[in-house]
């Protein structure tokens, strides 16, 4: 049974459009404006419909798909939190991850880490690190549903912004 709010009304089309667009950040923003316009301009006599409209007005911020970002350093991503990161990547959820790869444990004063390249000298690795750098990007790509970009923040800020936009748009 259809709710009286949408039965044979233009709202039915608007709500269907939202259902089709709710998983896209850009599309859900566009369609949510139409939903908000429709509910704010509606006048209904049914008490249940009025209550529903008021609840939708209170929660209108939830109509737009949220962008979710996890931001951390390489010590977390490559080592301490890798199990959790791997779990999130394997889940298939639409989550973006930004890893600041300094190639050392920055919080410990520069010790070599799993992100330190082979032969690099660091604290407690004065003769150079013996093992090669863990390839986190390749490991993430093995899931097949992950967008990976590697950028040099100091080299080209436009490339960084482009990668962030591409990550956000990737489904």
PLM segments and residue spans:
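N-terminal leader/propeptide and maturation segments of large enzyme subunits in energy/redox metabolism
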Residues: 1-48, 52-55
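Conserved thiamine diphosphate
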Residues: 4-5, 62-64, 119-169
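Charged/polar, solvent-exposed surface patches and flexible loops
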Residues: 13, 17, 37, 58, ...
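Short linear motifs at secondary-structure transitions and domain/linker junctions
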Residues: 43-46, 72-73, 114, 122-124, ...
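A generic structural signal for ordered alpha-helices
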Residues: 46-49, 54, 66, 114-118, ...
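Thiamine diphosphate
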Residues: 47-107, 111, 155-170
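Active-site cavity-forming subdomains of large catalytic enzyme subunits
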Residues: 89-135, 145-147
């Amino acid at each position: 049974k259809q709710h009286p709010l949408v039965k044979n009304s233009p709202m039915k089309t608007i709500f269907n459009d939202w259902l089709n667009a709710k998983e896209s950040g850009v599309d859900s923003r566009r369609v949510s404006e139409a939903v908000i316009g429709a509910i704010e301009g509606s006048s209904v006599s049914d008490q249940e419909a009025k209550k529903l409209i008021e609840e939708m007005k209170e929660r209108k911020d939830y109509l737009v798909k949220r962008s979710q970002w996890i931001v951390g350093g390489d010590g977390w991503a490559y080592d301490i939190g890798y199990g959790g990161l791997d779990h999130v990547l394997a889940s298939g959820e639409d989550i973006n991850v930004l890893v600041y790869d300094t190639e050392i444990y920055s919080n410990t004063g520069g010790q070599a880490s799993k992100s330190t390249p082979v032969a690099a000298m660091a604290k407690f690795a004065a003769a150079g690190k013996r093992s090669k750098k863990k390839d986190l990007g390749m490991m993430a790509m093995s899931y097949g549903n992950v967008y990976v970009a590697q950028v040099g923040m100091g080299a080209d800020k436009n490339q960084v912004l482009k990668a962030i936009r591409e990550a956000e748009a990737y489904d």
